[in-house]
């Protein structure tokens, strides 16, 4: 199951283990149990610190296996086969159960260790989901750190009865003590913030006490990361306030056009961005959403008010708030979000195996989604508002070659239908004849572009009719000292490599602004100061 190269790498990782790892496997006579045992038996051969016990017990999930160590009360289990994107989760779990320290911040680790109460987490994932490992790894670490936290990571494809009973149509989906806890990508910081009700107040007080920055970057995507690095390299006080570090990149499956890196995945790039920024003296403030920008007053400081009630001040600000998936804004979309309405075909596609779905949008993203889904689902209907598809010709040719795809153009989606629990259909208007049409299906994947995260700037910073921040060729906005970069701006072509360049440029422009505004007004002023 593991090739020679992977075994060599894994053997090297397992040398970091400092205490015994006990694997307790719960199996039956299924082919899945045999497949899981093949993997576990290979792991045992890679380290003398790993042992395997096989049980034909009454565990509700078979095949599954738990990881523990003598003398420690750890409850961490994988149900299914953690390969694909989740293989890294398995490796990290082995290391952490085996005593290798986590790289999480010491303050966060202490917060997890002191959580009060009993928490039984269940995370449903799919092997093709790039968002799932973050959640699985966060909760696995929590289970290692705190004996009152238990976690089971469940491959939804292997436990379809549970998925259907709980009507799970989006991953990752997390249950806590039998009740729905949350869905979508979550960091350990975000999870702890939901469990520790006083965390937000403590965080706000800590932020409010910070001194003013020279450069404050709002947003932690490619543009914000580049801006932070370039600003910090100038030796000036730099801060980053971000709702989630990595931004939209975290939701990108495959990246093949970032020059010098032939192929990577969004979460890997996001992790690399944060690692690079942390090499410099940058104050990173995660889980922070900006709600208002107040231009500089008499003190020369721009103020950013945050959703938690705290405020940050800075001599200059770089706005790199990025963009989010654009919604259809039709009846039923919000009601059935994560109940059949989805925005990530890579994550949620496997949950619709054998079902009928629609993809809304005929650009590159929509056509790529339809092609990917066609290999999983029973049938795909692609719905495009325009009278023709806008995707690259090579993608259109591939799409039209698929036998289980129907293309509808000149169609305006008007409603998502459901039975109160899940999606059952879609309504669209034929824009050529005006007829109303219904499609029976179980899933709707929305791929109609991005919407800039700039609502909090309305009335303060000049925005285009599309809501993008208007910038000049130096990244300057119409507010002195406020710069902007990335997908939230009017700069054409929303690409990672372009966003990084724009972020770097904005930082250099901000530094130039600081020099010019702090310089003495006249030569006489310099002489007097001397």
Swiss-Prot record:
Annotated signal peptide: none
Annotated FAD binding sites: 214-229, 477-487
Subunit structure: Homodimer.
Cofactor(s) needed by this chain: FAD
Disulfide bonds: 344-347
Gene, per the UniProt record: ahpF
Reported function: Serves to protect the cell against DNA damage by alkyl hydroperoxides. It can use either NADH or NADPH as electron donor for direct reduction of redox dyes or of alkyl hydroperoxides when combined with the AhpC protein.
CDD domains noted in UniProt: AhpF_NTD_C, AhpF_NTD_N
Biological source species: Xanthomonas campestris pv. phaseoli
Record keywords: Disulfide bond, FAD, Flavoprotein, NAD, NADP, Oxidoreductase, Redox-active center
GO terms of molecular function: flavin adenine dinucleotide binding; NAD binding; NADH-dependent peroxiredoxin activity; oxidoreductase activity, acting on a sulfur group of donors, NAD(P) as acceptor
Superkingdom of this protein's organism: Bacteria
Phylogenetic placement of the source organism: Bacteria, Pseudomonadati, Pseudomonadota, Gammaproteobacteria, Lysobacterales
Extra information: The active site is a redox-active disulfide bond.
PANTHER family reported in the protein's UniProt record: THIOREDOXIN REDUCTASE 1-RELATED-RELATED (PTHR48105)
Cofactor remark: Binds 1 FAD per subunit.
Residues annotated as binding NAD(+): 356-370
The family this protein is said to belong to: Belongs to the class-II pyridine nucleotide-disulfide oxidoreductase family.
Keyword Oxidoreductase applies: yes
Pfam (any one): Thioredoxin_3
Biological processes, Gene Ontology terms: response to reactive oxygen species
Descriptive protein name: Alkyl hydroperoxide reductase subunit F
EC numbers: 1.8.1.-
């Amino acid at each position: 199951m593991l090739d020679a190269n992977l075994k060599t790498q894994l053997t090297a990782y397992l040398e970091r283990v400092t205490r015994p790892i006990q694997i307790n496997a719960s199996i039956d006579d299924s082919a899945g149990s045999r497949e899981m045992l093949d993997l576990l038996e290979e792991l045992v051969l890679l380290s003398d610190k790993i042992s395997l016990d096989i049980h034909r017990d009454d565990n509700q999930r078979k095949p599954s296996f738990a990881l523990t160590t003598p003398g420690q009360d750890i409850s961490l289990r994988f149900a299914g086969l953690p390969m694909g994107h989740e293989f890294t989760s398995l490796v990290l779990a082995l290391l952490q159960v085996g005593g290798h320290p986590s790289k999480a911040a010491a303050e966060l680790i202490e917060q997890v260790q002191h959580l009060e109460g009993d928490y039984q987490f269940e995370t449903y994932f799919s092997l093709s989901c790039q968002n799932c490992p973050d959640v699985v790894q966060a909760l696995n670490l929590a289970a290692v750190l705190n004996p009152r936290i238990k976690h089971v990571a469940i491959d939804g494809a292997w436990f379809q009865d549970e998925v259907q009973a709980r009507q799970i149509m989006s991953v990752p989906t997390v249950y806590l003590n039998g009740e729905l806890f949350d869905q979508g990508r979550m960091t350990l910081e975000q999870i702890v913030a939901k469990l520790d009700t006083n965390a937000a107040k403590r965080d706000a007080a800590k932020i409010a006490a910070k001194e003013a920055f020279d450069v404050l970057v709002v947003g932690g995507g490619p543009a914000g990361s580049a801006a932070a690095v370039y600003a910090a390299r100038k030796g000036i006080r730099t801060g980053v306030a971000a709702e989630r570090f990595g931004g939209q990149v975290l939701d990108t499956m495959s990246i093949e056009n970032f020059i010098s890196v032939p192929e990577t995945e969004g979460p890997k790039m996001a992790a690399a961005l944060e690692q690079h920024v942390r090499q410099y003296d940058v104050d990173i403030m995660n889980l922070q959403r900006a709600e208002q920008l107040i231009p500089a007053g008499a003190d020369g400081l721009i103020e950013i008010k945050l959703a938690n009630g705290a405020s940050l001040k800075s001599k200059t600000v770089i706005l790199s708030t990025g963009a989010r998936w654009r919604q259809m804004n039709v009846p039923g979309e919000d009601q059935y979000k994560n109940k059949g309405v989805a925005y990530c075909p890579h994550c949620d596609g496997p949950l619709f195996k054998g079902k009928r779905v629609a993809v809304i949008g005929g650009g590159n993203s929509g056509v790529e989604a339809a092609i990917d889904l066609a290999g999983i689902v029973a049938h795909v209907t692609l719905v495009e508002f325009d009278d023709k598809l806008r995707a690259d010709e090579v993608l259109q040719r591939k799409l039209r070659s698929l036998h289980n795809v129907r293309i509808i153009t000149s169609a305006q989606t008007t409603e998502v239908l459901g039975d109160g629990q899940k999606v059952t259909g879609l309504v669209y208007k034929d824009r050529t004849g005006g007829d109303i049409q219904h499609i029976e299906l179980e899933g709707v994947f929305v791929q109609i572009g991005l919407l800039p995260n700039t609502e909090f700037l309305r009335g303060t910073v000049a925005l285009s009719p599309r809501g993008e921040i208007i910038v000049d060729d130096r990244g300057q906005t119409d507010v002195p000292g406020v710069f902007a970069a990335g997908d939230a701006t009017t700069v054409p072509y929303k690409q990672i490599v372009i966003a990084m360049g724009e972020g770097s440029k904005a930082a250099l422009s901000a530094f130039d602004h600081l020099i010019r505004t702090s310089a003495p007004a006249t030569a006489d002023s310099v002489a007097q100061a001397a």
